[in-house]
Swiss-Prot record:
Family statement: Belongs to the HpcH/HpaI aldolase family. KDR aldolase subfamily.
Catalysis performed (reactions): 2-dehydro-3-deoxy-L-rhamnonate = (S)-lactaldehyde + pyruvate
Its biological purpose: Catalyzes the reversible retro-aldol cleavage of 2-keto-3-deoxy-L-rhamnonate (KDR) to pyruvate and lactaldehyde.
GO CC list: cytoplasm
SUPFAM superfamilies listed in its UniProt record: Phosphoenolpyruvate/pyruvate domain
Any Pfam family hit: HpcH_HpaI
Cofactor(s) this protein cannot do without: Mg(2+)
UniProt binding sites for Mg(2+): E153, D179
Highest taxon above the source species: Bacteria
Positions bearing the site annotation: Increases basicity of active site His: D88
Protein name: 2-keto-3-deoxy-L-rhamnonate aldolase
Organism (species): Escherichia coli O157:H7
Gene name linked to the record: rhmA
Gene3D superfamilies, A to Z: Phosphoenolpyruvate-binding domains
Cofactor binding, per record: Binds 1 Mg(2+) ion per subunit.
């Protein structure tokens, strides 16, 4: 199979294009495929807080493959064995949580690259990513098609942001608002003025360094604000939250005493 590996999500980030995404936490291929038909530019399949197994992630990648929406996988952490598994099932774009230092970022980059550029284990003949060994020169071309995003979501990470941005192989940095606000002393309050100031400053620093800047905003006004600050890959909702809101709204139409969606915290 003479196939040229491409990653439209990465190419659009390189061009500075704005991409609007949706967080998938429902853990099913059925729900993932429904989301893929909606037209979002990218879909974050969450393995950190949602109870997704490797096989769950695999099935969701299969479900969205026929559609234009580009999948992004967030594993529970950035260990070398887990990254290897996620890449082998066909993920081309990864979002690695809780990256606090440049050394951590370099380790993650190494885990995504085959030798001599990194430490990714070789097993193309059993990997969906290589179409079970049928993609010619897979190892030679895969590095260019991988997109690696890291999450900055603590005070320590903010202190090290410039060094993280200097790491070769990092394509973008995602601001994690919930963990960041907690780390700064404002738990469940990403809207606090000090947190907002830091988010704005961080987004501008990321873009000034030539990297893509990402954010998850469950409130539309916050999403618009982040886009105005320069963020160019922004998730504007979480499927489970949207689902629960829709259920509440429908119930409120028919049962007295129900006032629609409950007020929820940040993610």
């Amino acid at each position: 199979m003479n196939a040229l590996l491409t990653n439209p999500f990465k190419e659009r980030l390189r061009k500075g294009e704005v991409q609007i995404g949706l967080w998938l936490s429902s853990t099913t291929a059925y729900m993932a495929e429904i989301a893929a038909t909606s037209g979002y530019d990218w879909l974050l399949i969450d393995g950190e807080h949602a109870p997704n197994t490797i096989q769950d992630l695999y099935h969701q990648l299969q479900a969205v493959a026929p559609y234009a929406s580009q999948p992004v996988i967030r594993p529970v952490e950035g260990s070398k064995p887990l990254i290897k598994q996620v890449l082998d099932i066909g993920a081309q774009t990864l979002l690695i949580p809780m990256v606090d230092t440049a050394d951590q970022a370099r380790q993650v980059v190494s885990a995504t690259r085959y030798p001599p550029y990194g430490e990714r284990g070789v097993g193309a003949s059993v990997a969906r990513a290589a179409r079970w060994g049928r993609i010619e020169n897979y190892m030679a071309q895969v590095n260019d098609s991988l997109c690696l995003l890291v999450q900055v979501e603590s005070k320590t990470a903010l202190d090290n942001l410039d060094e993280i941005l200097d790491v070769e192989g990092i394509d973008g940095v995602f601001i994690g608002p919930a963990d960041l606000s907690a780390s700064l002393g404002y738990p469940d309050n990403a809207g606090h003025p000090e947190v907002q100031r830091i988010i704005e400053t961080s987004i501008r620093r990321i873009r000034a360094a030539g990297k893509a800047a990402g954010f998850l905003a469950v409130a539309p006004d916050m999403a618009q604000q982040c886009l105005a600050w320069g963020a160019n890959f922004v998730a504007v909702g979480v499927d489970t939250m949207l689902y629960s809101d829709a259920l509440d709204q429908r119930l409120a139409m028919f049962k007295s005493g129900k006032n629609g969606p409950r007020i929820k915290g940040s993610y």
